[in-house]
Curated annotation (Swiss-Prot):
InterPro entries, per the entry: Competence_ComC (IPR004288)
Residues that make up the propeptide removed upon maturation: 1-24
Signal peptide limits: none
Family: Belongs to the ComC family.
A single GO cellular-component term on record: extracellular region
Gene this chain is encoded by: comC
Top-level lineage group: Bacteria
NCBIfam families, A to Z: ComC_Streptocco
Listed name of the protein: Competence-stimulating peptide
GO terms assigned for molecular function: pheromone activity
Keywords for the protein's UniProt record, in alphabetical order: Competence, Pheromone, Secreted
Organism: Streptococcus mitis
Its biological purpose: Acts as a pheromone, induces cells to develop competence for genetic transformation.
């Protein structure tokens, strides 16, 4: 369960960072999903 908590904290941190960046709002959701669910090659 420790990993889950760390992931949630990491996501919350990224959300704060993304909120600061108001330039490319349309791209942010895609970037955020790449962070949370990395694409398998």
């Amino acid at each position: 369960m420790k990993n889950t908590v760390k992931l949630e904290q990491f996501v919350a941190l990224k959300e704060k960072d993304l909120q600061k960046i108001k330039g490319g709002e349309s791209r942010l959701p895609k970037i955020r999903f790449d962070f949370i669910f990395p694409r398998k090659k």
